[in-house]
Curated annotation (Swiss-Prot):
MI transport activity inhibited by D-chiro-inositol (DCI), phlorizin (Pz) and sodium (Na(+)). Insulin increases D-chiro-inositol uptake. Residues 1-27, 78, 124-180, 230-272, 330-375, 440-446, 501-521 are extracellular. The gene is Slc5a11. GO terms for biological process: apoptotic process; myo-inositol transport. Its main location: membrane. PANTHER family: SODIUM_MYO-INOSITOL COTRANSPORTER 2 (PTHR11819:SF171), SOLUTE CARRIER FAMILY 5 (PTHR11819). It is a multi-pass membrane protein. One of its GO terms (cellular component) is plasma membrane. The keyword Cell wall biogenesis/degradation does not apply. Keywords: Apoptosis, Cell membrane, Ion transport, Membrane, Sodium, Sodium transport, Sugar transport, Symport, Transmembrane, Transmembrane helix, Transport. Involved in the sodium-dependent cotransport of myo-inositol (MI) with a Na(+):MI stoichiometry of 2:1. Exclusively responsible for apical MI transport and absorption in intestine. Can also transport D-chiro-inositol (DCI) but not L-fucose. Exhibits stereospecific cotransport of both D-glucose and D-xylose. May induce apoptosis through the TNF-alpha, PDCD1 pathway. May play a role in the regulation of MI concentration in serum, involving reabsorption in at least the proximal tubule of the kidney. It comes from the Eukaryota. Residues 49-56, 100-102, 202-208, 294-308, 397-418, 468-479, 543-652 are cytoplasmic. It comes from Rattus norvegicus. This is Sodium/myo-inositol cotransporter 2.
């Protein structure tokens, strides 16, 4: 008699095909094309209406954004296609615990506006490396971070979002992967290069609306298919692949699938790690990452920046319902594909022997939605991908131009800075295209967990340096640099070990070293943060005290101090001006950049005749916001946000709203704990 527990025989290939000959209907294609045209029109509209011929106008949207586009851009910059694919995939695989990242981010984005942003505004900084330059002096720390920021985003967030978007585009449209990605990058780079941050923020606002509409529609279809939340809870634990081995635990739903807080030793996300290990990388992302902070600095004043953070915080409640729960529904509806447990079968289903949970969201879209709505959700995924790409392109360009290039060429003219910023965006596009083969080879069973583990190895040291610099006046350059380098080295060692000793599949023994196998990445984040903090504290305590100029208006406790009238550290950023105690600007901080621009302009027009230009050159200069007839030296340089003053009534309303938002988050933590 044959054993009933033998290895399962794969069913016919057509039953295993995750996307069985699904193709977009003409109506879907029309919706997608209309979306592309609409986004491009909005991007070009913002390009025409905004001031792009200055460094501040291009990199900080002129500093006149109101709260709602700032909030929408914060949310869209955070929630890329990796969220849709990754959160839904992790929900299908392990349940709702992954939503802890979103609820944790809710607190962090509020801390940005209420705690960290006032320090940045008081210090008159436009980039995060610039803050560290003014806070600690020297060039070691800002140059180190200015080098890390673009590479970190390009090789992690950019990589994941491109792969996630490629899953959707390639399988639904049956396009060549390179063709799909190159097309997206081309459109994205066009309005990023042309319009700067203003174009990015306006298109982010549009894409946030599209993402939310599409995601709400799919959530409704998903819950209707399983009978609501009660049906989801009843059926999720029965969602098993029919071809799994009966004597194997692989592919079984977790018993704690509907709980966020899980066992501290044996679970996939231990609760101490969620509370503490997750918080430090979250603070890095929301409070010190250039992509996020740059959007808040583009607000017209502190109240609008707070309003934007509040809007983003409320929206951070939604991913649990819009992405995680639909991913769990997908496992119920398509268990043989989404919940496949045998490596050979998974390889045939999605070309990934580790598991196919990451196809959960695309599977719902392509199988559940009717014609037309399917095209809308394609637009949603494209919107999510393009939002992330524009955020990375613009912010990486800002850091390279304002911190690295300006350090190399301190007398660079404003025109040169504008050209360098745009060329760097094009260079990132080229790197992104060349990175596609690596994206294809790096797909894992849970995409979202992949990026979070990498973040836990690289971000805590940077976050600790910012925290110590903002809240302990005794922190000096030697302590911060020592802690930063030690932390980054330890994180790189763990990262390399993770790549060398790959996590085995469910049906394989785990022979990895104990430091990799037994130390969860969130626990390692706690260890790394503690080590960095102790190093910064110890070295700073036993070395010289920072000068007053490196502390005044650059910490939480000194943000209201009057500006030093002499012996102050000269700002190296061409946007900086001195701000008086009452918030008015003074002319003492004008950068050498203006002198260079004025000198060049005077020389070019000394004979009273403007040089002739070809029509092609004129078009290119207009696209980049650098028309020849606009080469006039500005009469003054406007600061980003010049005052910490707020209207008392508005401040009270914002504070009350902040308390309400935090209360909602605490309720959700408790309800799903």
């Amino acid at each position: 008699m044959e054993s009933t527990t033998s290895s399962p025989q794969p069913p016919p290939s057509d039953a295993l095909e995750a996307f069985p000959q699904k193709s977009m209907e003409p109506a879907d294609i029309v919706v997608l094309v209309l979306y592309f045209l609409f986004v491009l029109a909005v991007g070009l509209w913002s390009t025409v209406r905004t001031k792009r011929d200055t460094v501040k106008g291009y990199f900080l949207a002129g500093g006149d954004m109101v709260w709602w586009p700032v909030g929408a851009s914060l949310f869209a910059s955070n929630v890329g296609s990796g969220h849709f694919i990754g959160l839904a995939g992790s929900g299908a695989a392990v349940g709702i615990s992954v939503a802890a990242y979103e609820l944790n981010g809710l607190f962090s984005v509020l801390m940005l506006a209420w705690i960290f942003l006032p320090i940045y505004i008081a210090g008159q900084v436009t980039t995060m490396p610039e803050y560290l330059k003014r806070r600690f002096g020297g060039s070691r720390i800002p140059i180190t971070l200015a080098s890390i920021y673009p590479s970190t985003h390009s090789l992690t967030i950019l990589q994941v979002d491109m792969y996630a978007g490629a899953i959707f585009i390639q399988q639904s449209l049956h396009l060549d992967l390179y063709l799909a990605i190159v097309g997206l990058l081309a459109v994205t780079a066009l309005y990023t290069v042309a319009g700067g941050l203003a174009a990015v923020i306006y298109t982010d606002a549009l894409q946030t609306v599209i993402m939310l509409i599409g995601a709400f529609i799919l959530m409704g279809y998903s819950f209707a298919a399983v009978g609501g939340m009660e049906g989801l809870k009843d059926q999720y634990f029965l969602a098993l692949a029919s071809n799994r081995s009966e004597n194997s635990s692989c592919g079984l739903p977790r018993e704690d699938a509907f709980h966020i807080f899980r066992d501290p030793l044996t679970s996939d996300l231990p609760w101490p790690g969620i509370l503490f290990g997750m918080s430090i990388p979250s603070l890095w992302y929301w409070c010190t990452d250039q992509v996020i902070v740059q959007r808040s600095l583009a607000a017209k004043n502190l109240s609008h920046a707070k309003g934007g953070s509040l809007m983003a915080a409320y929206l951070k409640v939604l991913p649990l319902f819009l992405m995680v729960f639909p991913g769990m529904v997908s496992r119920i509806l398509f268990p043989d594909q989404v919940a496949c447990a045998h490596p050979d079968i998974c390889q045939r289903v999605c070309s990934n022997p580790s598991g196919c949970s990451d196809i959960a969201y695309p599977k719902l879209v392509l199988e559940l939605l009717p014609t037309g709505l399917r095209g809308l959700m394609m637009a949603v995924m494209v919107a999510a991908l393009m939002s992330s790409l524009t955020s990375i392109f613009n912010s990486a360009s800002t850091i390279f131009t304002m911190d690295l290039w300006h350090h190399i060429r301190p007398r660079a003219s404003e025109r040169e800075l504008m050209i360098v910023g745009r060329v760097f965006v094009l260079a990132l596009v080229l790197v992104s295209i060349l990175w596609i083969p690596v994206v294809q080879a790096s797909q894992g069973g849970q995409l979202f967990i992949y990026i979070q583990s990498i973040s836990s190895y690289l971000q805590p040291p940077v976050a600790v340096v910012f925290i110590m610099g903002c809240f302990w006046k005794r922190t000096n350059e030697k302590g911060a640099f020592s802690g930063l380098i030690l932390g980054l080295l330890l994180g790189l060692v763990r990262l390399i070990l993770d790549f060398v000793y790959v996590q085995p599949r469910c049906d394989q023994p785990d022979d990895r070293p104990a430091v990799v196998k037994d130390v969860h990445y969130l626990y390692f984040s706690m260890i790394l943060s503690s080590t960095t903090l102790i190093t910064v504290f110890t070295v700073s305590w036993f070395t010289e005290t920072p000068s007053k100029e490196m502390v005044s208006r650059l910490t939480w406790f000194t943000r209201h101090e009057p500006v030093a009238q002499k012996d102050s550290v000269p700002p190296e950023n061409p946007l900086s001006l001195t701000i008086s105690q009452n918030g008015t600007t003074e002319a003492t901080g004008i950068s050498i950049q203006l002198e260079s621009v004025q000198e060049a302009t005077t020389k070019a027009h000394s004979d009273g005749v403007s040089p002739k230009q070809s029509k092609v050159l004129k078009a290119i200069l207009w696209l980049c916001g650098m028309e020849k007839d606009k080469e006039e030296p500005p009469s003054k340089v406007e600061p980003v946000i010049v005052s910490l003053e707020e209207n008392p009534l508005v401040k009270t309303l914002l504070d009350v709203n902040c308390i309400v938002c935090i209360s909602c988050a605490i309720f959700l933590w408790g309800y799903f704990a």
